[in-house]
Amino acid sequence: MKTKFCIEEENIYKPQLPDVMEAIFDAAYLIFDLIAAILFFIFSQGKILFILYGILTLTLCGGDAFHLVPRIIRTIRGTNDKIKRQLGIGLQVSSITMTIFYILLMYIWKFTFPELKIPVIIGAVIWISAAFRIVICMFPQNNWCTDEGNMKLSVIRNAVFA
């Protein structure tokens, strides 16, 4: 008695060259950023400006790693629901760390140009806007982990950067 086996072709993911190049760029960027942060700390000699540059660089690298590492994994293995969720959470974390990045940049500007004073109201507006943006980023209605997102909240949370 012959038995007929039905073998379905597996849908094997094969990365395309542009995707591989993007993954290489993303990995190189994260490595460069991490090395730059370490160098800022090593050579800071206790100078607050260079310590702030190191913190700024680590903030950028850390936030970007949350969405770039899943992108690199997606390039290598293909996509699935877990990767989509990691990318969504990564974009949310990156959005929050970018806000912190701009706050740190304000302090770097203050230390770089001590003769230029920021009016207290401007500093307050920047801090309030940053807090507002972070709160907006935390709303589940942003749909970070879905394909559709939320255009209205995207505009609101990014308007503070305008």
Locate each region found by the language model.
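Short, Lys/Arg-rich, polar N-terminal cytosolic tail immediately upstream
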Residues: M1-Q16
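Membrane-proximal helix-loop-helix units in multi-pass membrane proteins
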Residues: S94-A162
